[in-house]
Amino acid sequence: MIDRYKHQQLRIGLVSPQQISAWATKKIPNGEIVGEVTKPYTFHYKTNKPEKDGLFCERIFGPIKSGICACGNYRVIGDEKEDPKFCEQCGVEFVDSRIRRYQMGYIKLTCPVTHVWYLKRLPSYIANLLDKPLKELEGLVYCDFSFARPITKKPTFLRLRGSFEYEIQSWKYSIPLFFTTQGFDIFRNREISTGAGAIREQLADLDLRIIIENSLVEWKQLGEEGPTGNEWEDRKIVRRKDFLVRRMELAKHFIRTNIEPEWMVLCLLPVLPPELRPIIQIEGGKLMSSDINELYRRVIYRNNTLTDLLTTSRSTPGELVMCQEKLVQEAVDTLLDNGIRGQPMRDGHNKVYKSFSDVIEGKEGRFRETLLGKRVDYSGRSVIVVGPSLSLHRCGLPREIAIELFQTFVIRGLIRQHLASNIGVAKSQIREKKPIVWEILQEVMQGHPVLLNRAPTLHRLGIQSFQPILVEGRTICLHPLVCKGFNADFDGDQMAVHVPLSLEAQAEARLLMFSHMNLLSPAIGDPISVPTQDMLIGLYVLTSGTRRGICANRYNPCNRKNDKNEKLYETNYKYMKEPFFCNSYDAIGAYRQKRINLDSPLWLRWQLDQRVIASREVPIEVHYESFGNYHEIYAHYLIVRSVKKETFCIYIRTTAGHISFYREIEEAIQGFSQACSYDT
């Protein structure tokens, strides 16, 4: 369907019997209305042609071959001069055979049938609206018991007997005996109701607004009572309140979408277009049919049997009619969702039939495999690896993938620059991988974002746009900070690459979908671009350090190699002296020269105006020099003072990893501040 904004969309929900009839029926030029499937047959075994009014009828679903009717006559499609537009003998219209992909039919059910999705699936919508136990409703649907209709004010048989209680077994089994007597049809139809028809009557009598009001009043009363002191009773109250909330939400949804509750009980059963449930001829002349065809045949057989029982014989036992209605209900249940009521239906080879639910749900269903997961043009797929040198909004595309995705744009660039005379010459240059091809590819990629998608796409951050750059290898490089939005890691995960073609798609990718514009979670507002997994381990290793305490800074005669910052294995003093550095650049330079390790503790001189020591902490040790100056050594810093107790300088105890991490954070903050100043 197409909404008012011209967006194509698909909506799955309840529809009225009138809407089903409008979808499935059509009026042929002679005025006859067709669409009802009344026969369970598919193809005639002799002529190999579809049976009339069967599951593949050409009158209902359209011709198998375009412009050719069931009689074999041919008409030119779209030729207004050709008259008539349908065959008067077989009633088949001369139209395109593609109509068999979307033209539906319907089965007129003799008795109402509940939709098993709304009865058996949890939560049961029918049970929620009627506020009755699911077990009781199932017994009513499958004709295990009946209920009395509160009809007229006249003294009826059941009123004289009292209200009907199905728990009384003798009374329950005595009712069918009256049905076997001729003339009790009026009594049966007037005073009791069973099967899906009983559910339909109760749903039709519901007033959704009154349901909302009554549920709200009851919810408030339960909230005012407070805890009873009995844990079991308190749990029952909580469950009841949750149920009332679900019931109100369901009623509001029905009102908002203009859906009537009785539509959950089917009177007309839609029949899928035949091209969606085909019969294919394989080698040896054998036929391979879709399971749905067999399930449809089962429904039609049982429905026709029930029709014969009600029309051909006036003295049919009522119990037999009820059993046949139950069989029709079970056949429709199997068609919609095989196995939902217990053991699934199997064929002669003990293979479970695939019902309508099996066709559309799951990874191999119609939606995820054919509609959502189908292969599209201008897309690729590869394994992702970490790209720590990338910017947040960039991704690395392998040359092999990039040249295929942007081949059309590269061909246009070669022709525009007069480097190729036609498309064939341009493709040959691309196959030869000439240097000019990579230069044009770089220019094209600079102005064209790509979309990365990791399945399953559970929220909008599952698809984000990036600025691609060429990388060597055959894997896609990704910044590790964007992994949380994709729920991805680098243990073999794959991602799909898509190229937005239209200007609208490119604008949306640049303005809304770039990774550096999606830093917060759309669900809860928390930061989504946070370090995870590999980055957390790297930050831990970078800032862990070797915890040796201040004893390594002591001077002792046995530690002869302290000035070289080396370990001494020949004595018990195994640790080296912690070096002093005037600034962070000297410390990083010493690390790059491999004079210290990444986790080696060191003393870094800190500016006095940047750090104020106002702690009352007592120094662990005090080292005095020959001129009277002394060092106050604390757990994480060191203060150099003069004889007059003036502070010369302060050293903090850190590692080269801490310094490197601090400088990265400082540069990021400075860059952010500059960007904010430019904006203002």
UniProtKB/Swiss-Prot annotation:
A cellular component term, taken from the record's GO annotations: chloroplast
Class of enzymatic activity (EC top level): transferase
UniProt-annotated binding residues for Mg(2+): 489, 491, 493
GO biological process, one term: DNA-templated transcription
Binding-site list for Zn(2+): 69, 71, 87, 90
Co-factor binding details: Binds 1 Mg(2+) ion per subunit.
Catalysed transformations (reactions): RNA(n) + a ribonucleoside 5'-triphosphate = RNA(n+1) + diphosphate
Predominant localisation class: plastid
GO-annotated molecular function: DNA binding; DNA-directed RNA polymerase activity; magnesium ion binding; zinc ion binding
EC identifiers of the protein: 2.7.7.6
InterPro entries from the UniProt entry: DNA-dir_RpoC_beta_prime (IPR045867), RNA_pol_asu (IPR000722), RNA_pol_N (IPR006592), RNA_pol_Rpb1_1 (IPR007080), RNA_pol_Rpb1_3_sf (IPR042102), RNA_pol_Rpb1_clamp_domain (IPR044893), RNApol_RpoC1 (IPR034678)
Entry-linked Gene3D superfamilies: 1.10.40.90, 2.40.40.20, RNA polymerase II, clamp domain (4.10.860.120), RNA polymerase Rpb1, domain 3 (1.10.274.100)
Key word Magnesium present: yes
Record has Cytoplasm as a keyword: no
SUPFAM superfamilies: beta and beta-prime subunits of DNA dependent RNA-polymerase (SSF64484)
Role played: DNA-dependent RNA polymerase catalyzes the transcription of DNA into RNA using the four ribonucleoside triphosphates as substrates.
Subunit structure: In plastids the minimal PEP RNA polymerase catalytic core is composed of four subunits: alpha, beta, beta', and beta''. When a (nuclear-encoded) sigma factor is associated with the core the holoenzyme is formed, which can initiate transcription.
Listed name of the protein: DNA-directed RNA polymerase subunit beta'
Organism encoding this protein: Draba nemorosa
